[in-house]
Regions:
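Domain-scale recognition of functional cores that engage charged ligands
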Residues: 2, 7-14, 32, 36-342
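Conserved catalytic alpha/beta core of Sir2/sirtuin-type deacylases, generalized to analogous enzyme cores
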Residues: 7-27
Length: 342
């Protein structure tokens, strides 16, 4: 079934033939859907703490944190391509000669485009895009409304302009403050300073795409000194790539291996579940996990920190009780053995 070339490619991806056959069988049979029993509610899957309990768990974490090793684990390999899918559709399908953008939206039902245009001036990258567009098109202000919006989107996505869709979401302008704009990547450092640090040292680990390694390191070198000065923390930052051994194959409609035009097997990165491999490589007492674009502006960092500390405090409390029970079991087992032996 597999050619010598196929076998070499499979081996190069750190996979085995058995694993590929398992993938093929799974694709053919399909994935079983989970049957949901009911929605989680407070008291039934959702824990609601009283105010004094919140304080207890936060204090427990604060007291124990100096003796713990901690890291913030951030999946950050996602590219912005999917985020801008509706804008690519707009550029590909909208014809300036056929009517207004509003008429296009009505025909295409592109609701995301409506929201985008209504809030366009509030976007964190608005000024950057306008500035770049003026450089590319000197008479930008003389264009019609429709032409302006088309050129604005082109500047965002065109490879010869800002090429936002190439970059990972973590490195795009993300939050807009009065005097500056920050990326999601940068915000994670400020947030980590509140709860994922011990003895004024914070560890962060980002999983990234290999093609963006240079971009992330450049951004890190640009922001680290200022962030450390502002937070009075030292940051240890590491990166890893999603492992090739977690890639998956695809099948044609005839259930044959899908191959590129050069005859090589098409391997595609798996979802976030594949990052369990990267997570398992880390050795820390506590690992805080947060996706790259799940980060808030600075004014909410303290509130977010309290919830993270509560969760970690609950973890420590459960761990303490578990260890206590295990030690009691060990003691009683030893006691029982000594009684039956002598």
């Amino acid at each position: 079934m597999f050619s010598d070339k196929d076998l070499a490619e499979i081996k190069n991806h750190e996979l085995t033939v058995d694993q590929i056959n398992d993938q093929i069988a799974q694709i053919k049979s399909g994935m079983a859907f989970s049957k949901l029993k009911e929605a989680a509610t407070v008291g039934n899957g959702i824990l609601k703490l009283k105010e004094h309990e919140e304080t207890y768990f936060i204090n427990l974490f604060d007291q124990r944190s100096p003796e713990l090793s901690m890291v913030k684990f951030v999946p950050a390999s996602g590219a912005a391509t999917r985020m801008f899918k509706f804008l690519f559709e707009f550029l590909n399908n909208y014809d300036l000669t056929q009517g207004s953008i509003n008429s296009y939206i009505e025909k295409s039902n592109n609701k995301e485009l409506t929201k985008f245009l209504e809030a366009i001036e509030k976007l964190p990258f608005f000024e950057e895009v306008v500035h770049k567009t003026h450089k590319v098109i000197p008479n930008f202000n003389d264009l019609s409304f429709e032409e302006e919006r088309v050129e604005f989107v082109k500047t965002m996505l065109d490879e010869a302009r800002l090429n936002y869709s190439f970059y990972p979401k973590g490195l795009l302008p993300f939050h807009k403050y009065k005097a500056r704009v920050s990326t999601a990547f940068e915000e994670h450092f400020f947030e980590a300073a509140y709860y994922a640090s011990s003895l004024n040292v914070a560890n962060l680990h980002f999983t990234i795409s290999e093609i963006h390694n240079k971009n992330f390191n450049e951004e890190l070198n640009y922001i680290q000194e200022d962030i450390e000065a502002e937070t009075n923390k030292t940051f240890n930052t590491s990166f890893s790539y999603q492992k090739k051994s977690t890639d998956t194959i695809a099948l044609t409609l005839n259930d044959e291996l899908y191959k590129d035009t050069d005859g090589s097997i098409l391997f595609r990165p798996s979802g976030h579940g594949a990052l369990l491999e990267n997570l398992n490589d880390l050795d820390y007492d506590i690992i805080f996990i947060k996706n790259i674009d799940n980060v808030v502006v600075k004014e909410h960092h303290q509130n977010i920190s309290n919830y993270k500390k509560m969760l970690a405090g609950i973890l420590l409390d459960v761990q303490d009780k578990t260890f206590k029970f295990l030690n009691q079991l060990i003691f009683f087992n030893l006691y029982f053995i000594s009684k039956t032996t002598f």
